Every structure is written in C-alpha cells, then in structure tokens.
Design a protein with these regions (language model features):
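Hydrophobic h-region of N-terminal signal peptides that target proteins for export
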Residues: 7-17
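Short loop/turn motifs that connect adjacent beta-strands in outer-membrane beta-barrel proteins
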Residues: 17-20, 49-53, 90-98, 148-156, ...
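Transmembrane beta-barrel domains of Gram-negative outer membranes and organellar outer membranes
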Residues: 21-140, 213-229
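Outer membrane beta-barrel transmembrane domains
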Residues: 22-24, 28-33, 37, 64-69, ...
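Residues that define the transmembrane beta-barrel architecture of outer-membrane proteins
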Residues: 37-43, 77-81, 96, 133-141, ...
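Residues on the lipid-exposed face of transmembrane beta-strands in outer-membrane beta-barrel proteins
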Residues: 43-47, 83-89, 102, 141-147, ...
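Gram-negative outer-membrane beta-barrel domains
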Residues: 87-94, 99, 106-109, 126-154, ...
Length: 282
C-alpha cells in the first residue's frame, strides 16, 4: 500500500515537472492595411510558466508621413520600451491578469533605430524623428478580468491601466466559437498568452468590441508640425477586433484585425492594424 502511494506521488511529481512553459511573440503592424501611420508597430516577446510571465514590449507611433505637409496637425513620433511582469489566474470561466511594467518613453525606447532598420528592407515615407518628445520614465500597473457570461461563447473583459504615460479604464466583450478558453489580448489590454486550457489541438474564431475611457495619454501631446499647437487626445475610444487561431501540441498561431476610433481630433481616419501571435511550448 505504501509502495502504491509512493508510486502515485512520484507520478504526480513527474507530471508537475513536465508542465510546459510557453514562449510567445505578438507582432502588431498596420502594414496589414497598407499604411504606415499612428500606431505603426508593436512587439511583445514573453515567457509564461505556472501563471508567471516575464516579457519585453516595444510600441512605436509615427505621423501619417505620406500625407503630411507643413501646417497639418499630426502626432509626433515616439516609442515605448518596457520590461513586463505579469501574474495570471486562470480557471475554465475566468482569466485575471495583473501586470507591472517599467521602462522608458522617448529616444531611449529605440523607435527611430528600429524603424530605420526595418525601412532599409521595406521602404516607407521619411519621418523626422527630431520631433520626438524627450525621454521620460514609463511605468504602469494593469489589472484585467475576463469571464464568461450567460453562454460559453460569450465573454466580457474589463479592467484598468494606471501609468505615468497612459491611464485608462476599459470594458468590452467577445463572441468566440471553437476553443472558448482563449481570449483576445487586443480586447483585454493586458498580457494574454495565446494558450488553451482545453485541448492540445483546437481552433477558434472570435469577434468583439471594447470601449476605453482615457484619463491620461502622454503619447499624444506634441504636434509633428513645429508651428502647430499641442494635440488633445479623445477620452472615449472604441475598438473593434476579430481573429482566428490554431493550437497544436507544440504551439500555435493567431491572427487578428483591429479598428480603433480616432484618438485625436486631427486624425484623418480610424486606426487599423493587424496582429500575429506565435506560440511555442517548451
């Protein structure tokens, strides 16, 4: 009897030690819509295991340089570079995330260097990065909760981000078919590994919407036009998102398309971008 109990305990330990971690990369870019403006690039590289995640994030913002001319108001280029740590609590009907992020906004975030390297390979209109605001500390705390309501395929997301650069509250929903344990990072506004708590082999499609109420947005302030006034951001911001994903034993892929409402009055069109997430289990 004691031997049987010991074998069961050893098997449980072996199973626990065999639990895989997850490495994922999420790349957002407006090239999916043939543009290079406003929120032009975002990259998150992260490693998650046992509900603890560590990551590196870079977001880059530029004016609509292709259509800009002197006298036209637009956002000045800038970037963020953040180290991120997150705690995930997951259950079949719940996903809660708390993120702590610390880094810089401005020249030290390497937005100019990153876009220059990319545009050596992919041509794009010239952006005058001397208009970038000076550097500042970028720190934030984000809390997001996602949970099912009424039906398995209906999920709500809500939470808030409090930071030195950007502060907002958000609430939204998504309708998802297939593997309903997945959630959209683009509607959660928090680190969201594209991992399933269901089957090792699964597919999923979703569509959803979210509303943000901005309390602070330092990413929109300086005007790209040196003679123009400072820009004022819009407080209510809506987002539409849709996507699909596949999950295999070794990892997975996810594709998303997003449309954001105008973030400032001089913006000439909604912001649209695509996102690709690549997951590797190891």
């Amino acid at each position: 009897m004691k031997l049987a109990a010991l074998l069961v305990a050893c098997a449980a330990c072996a199973h626990a030690s065999a639990d895989e971690g997850h490495f994922y990369t999420q790349i957002a870019n407006d090239v999916a819509f043939g543009t290079d403006r406003w929120y032009t690039s975002g990259v998150r590289m992260a490693r998650e295991k046992d509900g603890i995640e560590w990551g590196l994030v870079q977001d880059i913002y530029t004016p609509d340089a292709k259509n800009w001319h002197p006298g036209k108001d637009d956002r000045a280029p800038t970037a963020r570079l953040l180290g991120s740590g997150a705690l995930h609590q997951r259950a079949p009907e719940l996903w809660q995330t708390i993120e702590f992020a610390l880094g810089v906004q401005g020249p030290a975030a390497l937005g100019h260097q990153t876009t220059s390297a990319v545009h050596h390979l992919v041509p794009a209109p010239h952006v005058d990065w001397t208009r970038q605001p000076g550097g500042r500390l970028d720190a934030q705390v984000a809390i997001t909760r996602s949970q099912r309501v009424a039906f398995d395929f209906v999920k709500v997301h809500y939470g808030a981000t409090l930071g030195t650069v950007t502060t907002f509250a958000h609430a939204g929903f998504e309708l998802r078919a297939g593997d309903t344990t997945l959630s959209s990072a683009l509607l959660r506004f928090a680190p969201t590994p594209p991992t399933s708590t269901g089957s090792d082999h699964a597919w999923s499609v979703y569509a959803g919407a979210s509303e943000r109420v901005m309390g602070r947005e330092e990413l929109i302030s300086r005007n790209y036009d040196p003679l123009g006034p400072d820009l004022k951001y819009r407080r209510p911001l809506s987002r539409l998102a849709a996507g699909l994903s596949w999950k295999w034993r070794w990892g997975g892929l996810a594709f998303d398309l997003v449309q954001d409402a105008k973030e400032f009055n001089a913006q000439t069109a909604p912001q649209r971008f695509g996102s690709v997430s690549i997951l590797i289990d190891f």
